[in-house]
Amino acid sequence: MSVEILNESGAEVDVSALSRLSRFVMDRMRVHPQAELCVKLVDEDTIAALNLKWMGKEGPTDVLAFPMDELRPGLMTEEPGEAILGDLMLCPAVATRQVDEARAQGQTDHTVEDEIDLLTVHGILHLLGYDHAEDEEHREMFALQARLLTEWQGTRGSGALPDDVLTGEVP
């Protein structure tokens, strides 16, 4: 699997760990070994501009997914084909703010690294065709996201997920 991580955010992020996580998720989701993924870490101005241009929403967001091939969940065959998953745009500054706000409210004890991991898994699932616009889709996607994160954390022995991530509750 080809995973390219580009850190243009100025934030200190373990790009090697992010690459390993991306490969782990792609492997668990049975993505073709020659599939391509690009994860770009960007600043708030960059992600805000992309959010406005592509989503019609003002302001920065935590993650945006730009799928290349039209993949859909549940359509994986015994031998999944080669694919270009697409691009993920992650904003470490927004992730940091989300963690700080959740901690201030006593809602989480996970780290910024855990949040970036969560956003990476979330984005890859979007690239694979998962969505959370409807309640049932939300439950399915967030349950899968929680399972993948739990498995990943078991491989590296750290991290604490908030209850809503583990349960897939609809906010």
Write out the residue ranges for each language-model feature.
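An acidic/histidine-cluster motif and surrounding catalytic segment
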Residues: M1-D117, L128-P171
